[in-house]
Amino acid sequence: MAISATELPIINEALTKVGQRRITAAQLATPDNKASNLAVDTYENHRDQLLEDHPWNFAIERASIVKESTTPIFDFNYEYAYPDGTTPADKLYALRILKINDDLLWAWGQWGWIPQPGFSMWKSEGRKILSNIDTPLEVRYIGRVTTYATMSAMFKDLLAQKLAMEWAEPLTGSTALGTETERRFTRKLGEARSIDGQEGIPDPIETSSWLMERFT
């Protein structure tokens, strides 16, 4: 898919961080230099990687989805397709599934979230969710956010720093600049995760057989 013109400020901030000239929306549509070609070839992948890296509050989406006509060969009774940006309607394309409604049987105890007996497991395979829960399946996931106004200010700054890190050596040939931009990105990433995680109560940690044995 084409890069949204609203995301151009992030690209240009990254280019400025590594001493390169800004590019225009026209150059995103028709790349004519090294910087614009690099942006068109790699920006979306780097953005999606960073979105998947952490459950950023602005990128979390909820959807109620219906089962597929096909069923898993074994282990599970039903399969569901990831939200793809069109089905369900008006929902973001899913990059990473965080929770489904058969994984919400938790209680808040003295030591935090404690899994309760009786929950059913689920797996994500090949952009399909496998579960024993019949339609509808309620999912909470990280969506592909492509609108500049939707992104938090903190994420925009972090993404620009990630792009600067990835593009420093290809654009300037400087290993030292690549190392410095990586150092800055690592510091900003830790700060951003910490601040983002302070909004609301903490999410329960993922289910596992080890946890069930530990708390039962």
Q: Which residues does each PLM region occupy?
A:
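Glycine-enriched, solvent-exposed interface loops adjoining structured elements
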Residues: 1-216
